[in-house]
Amino acid sequence: MKSPYQITNKIVELIASISEKIGEVNSAHLYRPPTELRKKNRIKTIQSSLEIEGNTLSIEQITAILENKKVVAPKKDILEVKNAIIVYNRLADYKPYSLTSFCKAHEILMKGIVDNPGSIRSKSVGIIKGSVITHVAPPGNIVRSLLKDLFDYLKKDKDLLLIKSCVFHYEVEFIHPFMDGNGRMGRLWQTVLLRQYSPVFEFLPIESLIKAKQLDYYKILGESDNQGDSTGFIEFMLQIINDSLEDLLINQNVNLTSDDRINIFKEKTGSDSFTRQDYMRQFKDISSATASRDLKEAFDKGTLEKTGDKRTTQYRFKNKKLNTTLSTRIQNAL
């Protein structure tokens, strides 16, 4: 299944702008944002995506939950947050083109909140706002086949991944594959897909920009439904993605730590040996003293091994995972 849409001038311009900004992100080493920024953005993502669905917890309350502090709030809201923390911590584990993985994420996200989380619905559902039915989802007996077609589209179609991620988000909202939790799953899985385009999207709070334009978000979803065409929604989401990258670049004055730089450099070099000069060529804005300090700290932690002395020193990453790998550090932070 391929959602009908048109390639407009706006879509072309936004894709070009996003591609340009990804280049700037890579040049500034922001595809793995600093630890504190990652934590801050992850909290914003969770809070915004859940608030769209009516969750009442604030950023401060979610931060308190992450720090194992007591929070006075509805039990359901607290459970939604705890589930979302687990799901977003496992983003790298999900298989973006797998329906099974998609359902597993829903199972975790909605555990204790709905009956049979992770199960594709078999009943008919509609969305009611006030006394008005705003959307009648496809009949339950065809939902599984619609999802199969949708995942086949992800795997086989030659569309750009940026467009595919928007189409998928829209189609999840339209198909309404679960009895509840469809909105947050559409937003979550677009992030899972965007990670394939660039790792920066793992910690980019796209949901917070959607929340800021929530009325427009639902309005454009409704218009796309009525028109049977997802062009408007694709334009809307590409603009959100572009704006989120722009915000990251504007606020890039958060300093990288030595651990951040070492992790970034490891991704670039792998197991190849290197010198301090090689390290400084990657990070042109640091002094030789800072470079030496970074490398010494990594050596003292057992991350690096070295041979030679002074100017002839050669470094190499040991054949084991860094103690401060991104996933470990984020899980510790959260």
Task: Show where each model-derived region lies.
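FIC/Doc superfamily catalytic core
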Residues: M1-L334
